[in-house]
Structures are given as structure tokens and as C-alpha cells.
Amino acid sequence: MQEHEKIPYDSLSFQEYWGEGMRLPGQSKGLDRWFFQWQWRNNPIVDDEQDSEKPVVTESGYYASYVIGAQWFDEAKTMPLVITTKHGCDRIDFLKMFSVCFNSGIEAKEFSKIYAVDMEQPRIKAPELKSVLSPLIVAHFLSVVRDIVKRGLKKDYVQREDNLKKVKGHIDISRNERMNVLKKRFDKVFCRYQEYSEDTLENRLIKKALIFSQHVLQIAGLSESLLSLQHTIHECLSAFGNVGDQIEVWEVKTIKHHKIFKEYDDAIKLAQMILHRYDYSITNITTAEEEFCPVFWIDMAMLYEHFVLGLLREAYGEKIHYQVHGHTGYPDFVCYSPKVVLDTKYIPRFEYGNLDTYIVRQLSGYSRDKWIFPIKPESNIPCVIIYPVEGEEENPFKSKRLEDFLNVEDRCLWNFHRIAVPLPILNDK
């Protein structure tokens, strides 16, 4: 099923179990995000609501929102629920979207709000989502590891054991007797000692996950964004040249997270997720295995928002301010030269219908907010709605000034403008 469609199971039978629906965890203040939610049948729809982000409800029940993913609908885990985008997940270049997001300078903790994965529940067969989850985790993981490489790998004291010519650390009496004394090898002594090295358990876990990620991308096909990630993997593996990749499954599970080294904390979580995804065996990274995915969700509205942020930052740099704290809320983007308020709305085909009244009020409030614009403007500040369409994956902002997008106004509203920013589409093979 696709976004905004009715759940294909008997909603009434599960109303006691789900209640109002499945609300996404860990939401920031002011957000109200759902994987699916109970909807009562709508009254007849008026013209200016045709392109609303709310689903058209012809029958009361649970309806999907703009969140895609896989989830078990029943407690016994016999009824899988797989939700895809209206555009078709097999057509969207998610790797391109993820790469643009990370190039915008988004922090790992912010990107973690876009998606969540539950590795403990049984996996769900969802071939239509095979191009989504693995590239997402790999791209997120590589962005974190890239930051670690820039700062330098963490070193620590590592326990070593070796048969040496000179005593180093402590002699392992029993093993030295068995390996050297009984064999009359008096020129050797078996020692246990500590060495300050990059070859720590955490770094070996990360390197192992990098090798797994390399195999994941190899079966993903060819694209410009894929080549960029492969280049990142080669750079990271070079930085881990003095680190081994041998690590046991029980060691992977026992590695503790770091509160001081935040990048390592995120990298360890993601590395454990990648290895768990393929049951800790690199031979399980196959096209057939990709058809089964763990329970997960991706908030497409937030992903699109960060994708647009990456495109804006690529074109206009630090002139674009993200989530400025205002008295009326947090606009997605604000530019002070020229003065513009921009907001993404994940509402496909928005160019044909009227803007919803609540959107007009929301952006009008931002443009008059003294916390956002402390100096009184000489005229009304332009408000821009950014919405998705299918099309070429190029950055529409890159070759234009922001003022150039303000030449065409909304047909019903002064100083309101719309910009279509395409979702990147994979080339037909």
C-alpha cells in the first residue's frame, strides 16, 4: 500500500489494540507524526482541500500518513504492513537524497529523528522497500565515520599476547612452559602486555561494518550517488589501515556506547545495526536477503525537508538559516538577504490546487514574527512553499538567485510563491 491509503486490515477489530494509532516516538515539541492514525470519514471535500496533506477518508479506519516503512499490525506478528511512497520506492534515488542531506552538515542526532529501526522483531518480506533501508543505514554510518576520520581515530590500551625474544609486560607462565620450555625453545618467552594502539575493539567493529557496507553498495547497482559513497568507504578504510577486522559476535554485542565520544557512540550503534541486519555474516548480503527487512519507518516529510536544506545550502551557503526560533514557531528556512521565509510541504502536485488556509496562516505568522525578524521590514516579507514533484535530480537553486523565484506570485495571495523541487529519480536501465 502507499502513503495516505487505508490500512488493508479490519480497523475496527484492532481499535482496542492500537487506539488512536501508531505515533512515532521521540518527537520534538510541536510535532505530531504518525505511522498510521485513526480517521473518521470526511465531509464532502471543498476545492481548496484537494491537495491537503491529510488523506481523503471515504471510510472510517486506520490510514497511513507520509511515513513509509514496514510494521507488524497485529500482536501475534502475522499481519505485515508495508507502506511505500506514492512515487514508488523503486524509482526514487534514496541514496541521492541521503547524500545531499549529509552534505548539508546535518548532525547525526538530527538525522536519527528521520528514521528508526527495530532489529529485535521478526523481519518482514518487503521487496518494494529493498532500495530504501540498507542504503539509508550505510549512508548514515559513513557520514559519522567520516567525521571520526577527520578528528582522528581514538586510541586505547589493547591487550596483546605474543611469543617474544625479550620479556614485555608479564610472562604467561603456563603457556610459556607449554610452548617454549617443554620444546626447549629458550630464546623465546610468551608474554602478555598492553599496547597503546588504534586497534581497539570499537575500531575493529567499525572497520568490519565498513567492509559490510562495501558489499551492500556493490549489490545496490550503479549511480552517481553510489560512486560518491564508495569513494567515502575507500577513504575511511585507508584511515583504518592499522586496525584489524577480526571481531567475534559476542564481542560485537558487548561493546558499550561512549557518552564522551558522541561520534563513536553513533558509529557503534549503526555498525551493530549493519552487522545484525545480515546476521553477522558477509555471505548473507545478497539480493534475495534484501527482500526481507526489519521493522522500520522513515518520515518522508522530514527527509524531504533535509534534502531541500542540502540543496539550498549547496546553492546559497550560510545565507540559509534552518529552524530559526520564533514566537510563532520554527520556520524550515529563513534567508535575511533577501528577506524570505521558506517552508517545505511534502504534498505532491501542490502546483495545481489552492494553498490550505492553515499553511497561509502559518507562513504569514513567520514573516511577521519579531523574534525571527527583529527589525521591522519595509514591506511584506515573501513566503515560499516548496513542494515535491517527479523530475530531473538537478538542484533547481544552483544556477539562480533566490530573488529569481519571487517573480511569479500565487494566483490568490500577495507575496506567496511556490517552488517545485523534484525528488531524484533513478535512471531507467
Task: Show where each model-derived region lies.
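Catalytic core segments in nucleotide and nucleic-acid processing enzymes
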Residues: 1-52, 287-429
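Residue(s) in the substrate-gating loop at a strand-loop-helix junction
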Residues: 2-285
